[in-house]
């Protein structure tokens, strides 16, 4: 992607985050926010606040007048401003990550936006095609972002992941629902503390900034679209992201693709977490 295009699409992504934030703000903490409207393309119920967020995100892309594809949990895949060929630019969007938090007015929810470029040969796009990632915490206004090869940032300040490598001093975020208790218990016994905050994209952003030392989701049910932005941000900050077997996560950019995930601020800590999981 040309530098001018990077600058342009970065501006679009930031504007999308700002406009979605404004659109959902009146619904946060209200009973109406949780009303189920339909079933989303990913097979899960779409709530009113999700639909409002996604409609606003689509509107931002429509307003550019440029051909672009959006991939989102509720709508699936939509080609915008396009006639004929599939657009070369892809926005992978979770318009509201942490929906339950937003409905209950728990201040930990936001948007995840990844910008990818389609393979010239027409191959299906994967996580490796993601060039930019943006995760905004609507409750605080903080924007975590990265451009491939250019580092990671919190607002305008460069960030780096944690250098903590001792398990007994590690703060770990996790999504553990549906995970076998033995696996969770084995980790809890060796780390300092565990946090469960309810937004994977934002918790991975915490790994990137060093607020968390590590994060894991072992369900094999984590949507690729949910981590498309934050995976890049963690890696650009110096962190390590793999599946629970230590393999690369390079899933297809679609709403059906799922994975497990183990992220750490550095390779040494990641290896220690993997060793703990392997003995179970």
Swiss-Prot record:
Alphabetized UniProt keyword annotations: Carbohydrate metabolism, Hydrolase, Magnesium, Metal-binding
Highest taxon of the lineage: Archaea
Organism: Methanothermobacter thermautotrophicus (strain ATCC 29096 / DSM 1053 / JCM 10044 / NBRC 100330 / Delta H)
SUPFAM superfamilies documented for this protein: Carbohydrate phosphatase
Binding site for Mg(2+) 1: 73, 94, 96
Residues reported to bind substrate: 97-99, 195, 200, 219
Gene3D superfamilies in UniProt: 3.40.190.80, Fructose-1,6-Bisphosphatase, subunit A, domain 1 (3.30.540.10)
UniProt binding sites for Mg(2+) 2: 94, 97, 226
Gene that this polypeptide is encoded by: suhB
Functional description taken from the UniProt entry: Phosphatase with broad specificity; it can dephosphorylate fructose 1,6-bisphosphate, and both D and L isomers of inositol-1-phosphate (I-1-P).
BP GO terms, sorted: inositol metabolic process; phosphatidylinositol phosphate biosynthetic process; signal transduction
Family statement: Belongs to the inositol monophosphatase superfamily. FBPase class 4 family.
Matches recorded under InterPro entries: Inositol_monoP_metal-BS (IPR020583), Inositol_monophosphatase-like (IPR000760), Inositol_monophosphatase_CS (IPR020550)
EC class: hydrolase
Protein name: Fructose-1,6-bisphosphatase/inositol-1-monophosphatase
Reactions accelerated catalytically: beta-D-fructose 1,6-bisphosphate + H2O = beta-D-fructose 6-phosphate + phosphate; a myo-inositol phosphate + H2O = myo-inositol + phosphate
One function term, GO molecular function aspect: inositol monophosphate 1-phosphatase activity
E.C. number: 3.1.3.11, 3.1.3.25
Pfam families: Inositol_P
Cofactor: Mg(2+)
């Amino acid at each position: 992607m040309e530098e001018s295009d990077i600058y342009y699409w970065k501006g679009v992504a930031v504007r999308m985050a700002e406009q979605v934030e404004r659109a959902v703000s009146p619904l946060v903490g209200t009973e109406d926010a949780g009303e189920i409207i339909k079933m989303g393309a990913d097979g899960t119920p779409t709530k009113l606040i999700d639909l409002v967020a996604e409609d606003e995100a689509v509107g931002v892309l429509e307003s550019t007048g440029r051909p672009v594809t959006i991939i989102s949990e509720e709508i699936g895949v939509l080609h915008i401003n396009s006639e004929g060929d599939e657009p070369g630019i892809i926005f992978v969007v979770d318009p509201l990550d942490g929906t339950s938090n937003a409905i209950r007015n728990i201040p930990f929810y936001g948007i995840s936006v990844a910008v990818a470029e389609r393979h010239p040969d027409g191959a299906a796009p994967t996580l490796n095609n993601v060039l930019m990632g943006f995760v905004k915490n609507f409750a605080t206004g903080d924007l975590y972002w990265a451009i491939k090869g250019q580092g990671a940032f919190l607002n305008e300040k460069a960030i780096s992941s944690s250098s903590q490598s001792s398990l007994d001093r590690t703060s770990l975020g996790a999504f553990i629902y549906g995970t076998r208790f033995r696996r969770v218990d084995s980790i809890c016994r060796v780390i300092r503390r565990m946090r469960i905050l309810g937004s994977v994209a934002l918790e991975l952003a915490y790994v990137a900034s060093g607020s968390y030392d590590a994060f894991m989701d072992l369900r094999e049910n984590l949507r690729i679209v949910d981590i498309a932005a934050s995976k890049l941000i963690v890696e650009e900050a110096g962190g390590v992201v793999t599946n629970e077997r230590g393999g690369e996560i390079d899933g297809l950019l679609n709403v059906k693709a799922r994975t497990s995930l183990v992220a750490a601020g550095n390779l040494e800590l990641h290896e220690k977490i993997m060793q703990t999981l392997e003995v179970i």
